[in-house]
Amino acid sequence: MHNLVINDLPEEGLPTALFEPSELIDFKIAWDWQRKWQEKLLAEPSNKQAVWMLEHFDCYTLGRGASEDNLLFDVEKPPIDFYRIDRGGDVTHHLPGQLVVYLVLDLRRYKTDLDWYLRQLENVLLDVLDGLGLNGYRINGMTGVWCNGKKVASIGISCRRWITQHGIALNVDCDLLGFNQIVPCGLKDYQTGRLNSWLPKLQMKEVRFLMKKSLNKRFGLLWI
């Protein structure tokens, strides 16, 4: 059992706009938010960075260069909304009960290295699981985070002149049935998991708190 105390977040760091809509958000809307903020940062590098923490309506997204062989449904008649997008990675599923974190960051303020950025996002997820008393881990040569033999978090990003988009998706208390319609991330030999399989009383607000805390730690973000 986890025993998390939600207290105050750190009060130092780079001022960063944090958006946490309480309602479910259509994927296209969230994607548009990111693109507009990215344009602002490209136009004026001194602008604030931005992070969104939200949950989506059911949808599938297919990253650039991904294989349609990993879609186990008729592409012409998808069972739910389906989007081809500009992030890296293969196909994934977004749905209620999954915490999605989108980051529009200027990597010139950190390190202009996409592999470093991906590993930092994994570190954020590992921090969150550790804060819940779970043993998360990476698998060499793959991107994402696993727990007890199951992949619980996916990462997919895009970057334009070192300004990022997209981010991470962490399965908290979502229905996993929709993952049966795809080969998640193109990985045939791995099962998909969710955190409340091991922590039945886990609440999304706890995960959000730990996510904000770790993003402050790993990227020095001060929430405004």
UniProtKB/Swiss-Prot annotation:
EC numbers, comma separated: 2.3.1.181
Active site annotation, chain numbering: C185
SUPFAM superfamilies per record: Class II aaRS and biotin synthetases (SSF55681)
Keyword DNA-binding: no
Major location category of this protein: cytoplasm
Domain BPL/LPL catalytic intervals: 45-223
GO biological process: protein modification process
Reactions listed under catalytic activity: octanoyl-[ACP] + L-lysyl-[protein] = N(6)-octanoyl-L-lysyl-[protein] + holo-[ACP] + H(+)
Alphabetical keyword list: Acyltransferase, Cytoplasm, Transferase
UniProt-annotated location(s): Cytoplasm
GO cellular component: cytoplasm
Pathway(s) this gene product operates in, as recorded in its UniProt entry: Protein modification; protein lipoylation via endogenous pathway; protein N(6)-(lipoyl)lysine from octanoyl-[acyl-carrier-protein]: step 1/2
Top-rank lineage group of the source organism: Bacteria
Cystine crosslinks: none
Binding site for substrate: R87, G88, G89, D90, V91, T92, H93, H94, S154, I155, G156, G167, I168, A169
GO molecular function, one term: lipoyl(octanoyl) transferase activity
InterPro entries: aa-tRNA-synth_II/BPL/LPL, BPL_LPL_catalytic, Octanoyltransferase, Octanoyltransferase_CS
Function: Catalyzes the transfer of endogenously produced octanoic acid from octanoyl-acyl-carrier-protein onto the lipoyl domains of lipoate-dependent enzymes. Lipoyl-ACP can also act as a substrate although octanoyl-ACP is likely to be the physiological substrate.
Entry-linked PANTHER family: LIPOYLTRANSFERASE 2, MITOCHONDRIAL-RELATED (PTHR10993:SF7), OCTANOYLTRANSFERASE (PTHR10993)
Note: In the reaction, the free carboxyl group of octanoic acid is attached via an amide linkage to the epsilon-amino group of a specific lysine residue of lipoyl domains of lipoate-dependent enzymes.
Protein name: Octanoyltransferase
